[in-house]
A protein has these predicted regions:
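Extreme N-terminal starter segment of soluble prokaryotic enzymes
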Residues: 1-3
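Acyltransferase donor/substrate-recognition loop-hinge adjacent to the catalytic core
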Residues: 146-226
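Short hydrophobic/aromatic beta-strand or adjacent loop that forms the aromatic wall/cage
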Residues: 53, 165-169, 360-365
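Active/binding-pocket-proximal capping segment
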Residues: 231-235, 258, 266-286, 320-327, ...
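A conserved beta-strand-loop-helix scaffold within acyl/acetyltransferase catalytic domains
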Residues: 20-60, 68-78, 200-305
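Acyl-donor binding region in acyl/amide transferases
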Residues: 79-160, 278-353
Length: 371
């Protein structure tokens, strides 16, 4: 008999965090999170300052067979004038009754809190993993992306959820270069306007530049579906750690003569295989696998691209595309994977300028009215 339990203590939190490792034991595509990072999400995240969080696990006897987290983000609801609860970190064995019990529990709590809709999978905000995998199950995801079995999609649609939006990802040969059109735009912009590429090491050493970048991030992404701007504390805790992990040769920040960030392209060494080898543990040897992949890499994750609205119409993104393409020349790089991008985001169209690209994964946010 299956029963649901709210996560309230260290024991149930441990079961919640470790359940996917059991569920995906024999899945070669699955990339486990580091346990310490996963626990921190639910205990010390700065998002908990304003978000409401509930978590559940489902057990069959003593065995965990499912999990889910439900989040109410009042900043999101106010920004979009809605009453929505987010569900995330949802995993379950191939039994629709488990999925139903998890989602019903999240819906019931949301109803008690006055919410009228439920959507997900989503995290506290855009900084966290989001989107249920609906295409590309044969591929290995990036470390910041969700992987799930194909039956998730089938079950959640049977339970009355519908598509809200999709994110798409592409696989590209990183050494293919850029189109002649992008190169011409790059040359024209650098000749006509006071734009320059800034050394990443300079940005890392100046907190004001990092804060300026995240102000720019909040501004450039505010038109993207479901985006929630980062707070000052989130920038201090999450953002600054992230920037300081970036490698100079894989990133490009473009600034104007006023010291404003005009555009950026952020990439990261692919760490998926290293995380698989670490098996959720940083010690005793997980750190070594991750450090080695960080310094000796053959794959790249194209994590984030953005352009200031004032420069976007001029095609400023061509500068970081050309800069990174030049950096990649001559390197022994086998592949690059784009980060999930909302399918109606105009930034997705830039990948059409690359002659060689293939569909890699598609993710979906589902939504349902709470009755």
């Amino acid at each position: 008999m299956i029963e649901i339990f709210q996560v309230k203590d260290r024991k149930t939190l441990k079961e919640f965090v470790r359940f996917p490792e059991v569920l995906y034991t024999n899945c070669p595509q699955y990339v486990p999170n580091l346990r310490m990072d996963e626990k921190a999400i639910f205990t010390t995240s700065p998002c908990l300052d304003y978000c409401k969080l509930k978590m559940w696990i489902v057990k069959d006897g003593k065995r965990v067979v499912g999990r889910i987290a439900a989040i109410i983000n009042p900043r999101y609801n106010k920004l979009y004038n809605v009453k929505r609860v987010r569900f995330g970190w949802i995993d379950f064995e191939e039994n629709i009754e488990i999925a139903k019990l998890l989602l019903d529990s999240a819906e019931q709590w949301a109803k008690e809190e006055g919410m009228t809709e439920i959507h997900g999978p989503l995290g506290y905000n855009t900084w966290y993993k989001q989107g249920m995998l609906v295409e590309g199950f044969e591929n290995v995801p990036q470390v910041n992306c969700i992987y799930n079995y194909p039956y998730y999609k089938e079950f959640i649609e049977k339970l009355g959820f519908e598509k809200e939006c999709d994110w798409v990802q592409y696989k590209l040969p990183p050494t293919q270069g850029v189109s002649d059109k992008l190169r011409r735009i790059n040359d024209m912009l650098l000749a006509r306007y006071p734009l320059r590429v800034v050394d990443l090491n300079v940005i890392k050493k100046q907190d004001d530049l990092i804060e300026r970048f995240f102000d720019h991030y909040n501004e450039t992404f505010k038109r993207v579906h479901n985006f929630v701007p980062l707070t000052k504390k989130e920038i201090d805790v999450l953002g600054k750690q992230y920037i300081k992990l970036l490698r100079p040769e894989l990133n490009c920040f473009v600034m104007d003569d006023q010291g404003r960030i005009a555009a950026y392209g952020i990439c990261f060494p692919s760490l998926s295989e290293a995380y698989q080898k670490a098996k959720g543990r940083l010690f005793p040897f997980g750190w070594w696998h991750i450090l080695r992949a960080y310094t000796k890499y053959s794959g790249i994750d194209l994590m984030m691209v953005g352009a200031d609205p004032a420069w976007q119409s001029k095609g400023v993104s061509a500068i970081f595309h050309c800069h990174l393409a030049d950096n990649f020349k001559g390197k022994d790089l086998k592949y690059s994977i784009t980060n999930p991008q909302i399918e109606d985001n105009s930034a997705v169209k830039v990948w059409d300028s690359y002659q060689e690209k293939e569909d890699y994964m598609r993710r979906r946010c589902y939504i349902k009215t709470i009755k």
